[in-house]
């Protein structure tokens, strides 16, 4: 008689870790939705400023009123291996993938560690979500031209870039106005 060797997902093997992730993510990031298919993933938008300090002026304008849209994908090796956080809105351009200054890997996931060994299996996924929200701010700073590269440690625990947010938002305002005007003109042209 042969036994069936059917693979099970990490969340079936470690229900207590699934419960912990759910509890922590739902408390801090209520707009994310969990899908338990395959190895499972979370999707949705992060808050614009979930950091543990006052929000600097200009965040809403810099982010166009919306936090980073993401997919957090688990692998069968979770929690030993960290999940991947993939930015979906905004989605980095193809030429930004694998360039160190953008902190995006070739598989389109964010580079949130110096090395994969920096992930501790007992760490919370919410630490990655905070880093991803910080990545969105830094991405906006690069796009606005007030920075040429992202910081090595991120802005989650470092407020040294906060003063640049309002400047970046001011630089982006004329671009946003032009884009809106162009879109309105195009729409008028199609309705005539």
Report the location of each language-model feature.
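UBC/E2-like fold recognition across ubiquitin and ubiquitin-like conjugation systems
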Residues: 1-67, 77-192
């Amino acid at each position: 008689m042969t036994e069936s060797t059917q693979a099970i997902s990490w969340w079936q093997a470690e229900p207590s870790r699934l419960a912990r992730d759910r509890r922590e993510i739902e408390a801090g990031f209520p707009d994310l939705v969990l899908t338990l298919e395959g190895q499972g993933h979370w999707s949705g938008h992060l808050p614009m400023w979930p950091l543990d300090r006052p929000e600097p002026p200009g965040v809403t304008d810099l982010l166009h009123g919306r936090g980073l849209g993401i997919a957090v994908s688990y692998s069968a090796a979770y929690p030993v291996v960290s999940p991947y956080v993939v930015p979906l809105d905004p989605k980095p351009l193809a030429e930004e993938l694998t360039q160190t200054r953008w902190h995006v890997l070739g598989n389109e996931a964010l580079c949130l560690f110096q090395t994969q060994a920096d992930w501790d299996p007992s760490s919370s996924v919410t630490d990655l979500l905070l880093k991803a929200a910080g990545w969105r701010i830094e991405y906006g700073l690069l796009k606005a031209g007030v920075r040429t590269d992202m910081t090595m440690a991120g802005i989650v625990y470092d407020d040294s870039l906060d003063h640049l947010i309002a400047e970046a938002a001011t630089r982006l305002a004329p671009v946003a106005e032009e884009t809106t005007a162009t879109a309105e003109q195009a729409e008028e042209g199609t309705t005539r």
